[in-house]
Amino acid sequence: MAPRTTDFLVVGGGILGLTLALELKRRHGDCSVTLLEKEPACGLHASGRNSGVLHAGFYYTADTLKARLTREGNRRLAAYCVERGLPLDRCGKLVVARDAADLPGLDELQRRGRATGVPLEMLSADDVRRLEPRARTHERALFSPRTATVQPTEVVASLVADAGAADIAVLTGVAYRGRGRGGVFTSAGTIDAGYLVNAAGLYADRVARDYGFSERYRILPFRGRYLLAEPGAPGVRTHVYPVPALANPFLGVHVTRRLGGDGAVKIGPTAAPALWREQYDGWRNFRLDECLTIAARELGMLWRDDFGFRRLALAELRTHGRRGLVRRAAGLVDGIHPAAFRRWGSTGIRAQLLDVREHRLEMDFRYEGDDRSFHVLNAVSPAFTCAFSLAAYLVQRIGERLHVVAAAS
């Protein structure tokens, strides 16, 4: 049963909601912490459908939160997996150049890595062949030794166990319904919450608007799918990624080494605009109001060509199907053929934040809050990697807001 009162109420049971709850309990051990998750278990959305790649942190400019938090997040999550005995593959990542036009992008990634202290190695084409014989590159490539792979569902399950051990009330199957005079309305009754922490992912903007925030922001969902290699298909020793278009928050179709010890791979993801927030498969979870609102917004972006949306949409159409994905991946790794990739993995939804005033996608983490509530509005990749460091950073921001109130009183 839901408690009638709680000091901190966290909405959302993904990896960030769990680490936020744990960090709140660690810093305010004498306070009660309750977490709401509308699904029957935690981590059934973005966290459980994550690629499992622990990013090193060299994609981001030094002035961003992503750059500040990813390197430490990588270290802490890898150490957590070792401590708990969870699967961890320190396979590294190659970023390859498809042609001469990609070389300046490689140089920029190396510069960003140096600025944020992320270890990187610029390799010649011969060095690349020794590291991963199947990788294809033009002249040179960038290698990230700190990039790794984990099993997201096992990480989430371990954090749920940690929350239980810390006396955090984890309420699954209990949905947030809104804010009222008596407290927070949920599907299990009203909870009088001293402070609300919103980590609701796809619905973070809706929860935030109940508290007067997210006025200029809306969640724009993107569907991501991977193709899985058939059993016995050739594997790779390391992840192989293209040089991304740094103006957009997507890393492009890549070849990802899966856990399991055999080097088996998956290729993807797609990045198709979704028409409703939980458009995973078929018409399940269809919401007409969401579909109408999101479709109208996407048509407007196409008409205005916001942030190069037309080019992004056209590129996605070319890689949306199985053959398109295989063709893009074959440009990165030799020996990738359609016959070896017949199965789709679970669909994931990226809860990408859109600034509706400036008509642009938010590239960095975004949050808003006051002395009554705090809202994590943009927690997209690499938020899984950053979970521990991001939670520590955000709880510090929450503490500052609470300290102002305490000092004033």
Where are the language model's segments positioned?
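Beta1/beta-strand and adjacent pyrophosphate-binding region of the FAD-binding site
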Residues: 2-16, 34
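Helix-loop-beta segment of a Rossmann-like dinucleotide-binding subdomain
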Residues: 5, 87-97, 109, 122, ...
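Dinucleotide-binding Rossmann-like beta1-alpha1 core, especially the glycine-rich loop
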Residues: 52-127, 131, 138, 252-254, ...
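Flavin (FAD/FMN) cofactor-binding core of flavoprotein oxidoreductases
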Residues: 126-129, 218-223, 228-230, 303-379
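Flavin-dependent oxidoreductases
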Residues: 19, 185-288
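Short beta-strand to alpha-helix junction loop
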Residues: 61-72, 96-105, 142-161, 314-324, ...
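Glycine-rich FAD pyrophosphate-binding loop
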Residues: 25-48
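Helical element adjacent to the flavin cofactor pocket in flavoenzyme catalytic cores
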Residues: 141-195, 199-206, 388-399
